[in-house]
Amino acid sequence: MAEIAWGSFADWVSGIGSLAAAGVALYVANSAQRVKLKGYCGHRLIIGLAQPQEEVFSVQVTNVSQRPTVVTNIGFTFGLWRWKRHGILTFVQDDIGHGIPKPLSDGETGNWNARLGSDNCWITNLVAQFSITRFSVLTWRIHVHTSNGGTTTLRPEKNIRDMLLVHIASRK
């Protein structure tokens, strides 16, 4: 009978262990360099003591990674593939939100607000300029672009999507 050469087996196990350790080290190094943003967007009410309440479309993101970044652009899309329509939201720093560009370090939050105006004229203009349909509302996405080359995609909350659907229904 042939005997098993256990010395060769130990060499193979140590080689596989070394390869696994190198893979884990590369994964950890790569994840530390990645910028991660968490956020949401939707309809908000701003209520102040000395001023009337104001309705806004709000985009808020928080940097949850250790690497600092700068938010360079906020845009949106409607539709899919070749029927996709793109738009850019412009924000200037004012009393209700930050401007763009906005640097975000670890744990810092950025907040951008677009006033909806009287009778929600911002939503009315959005529906008219982009010829938004019910299908477009389902595919509406907000894209937050950073200086590190990353893009975070947010789905608008139900409250603002419902407002769009009401304006679409009233337009017909």
Briefly describe each language-model feature range.
Residues 1-172:
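Membrane-aqueous junction of the first/signal-anchor transmembrane helix
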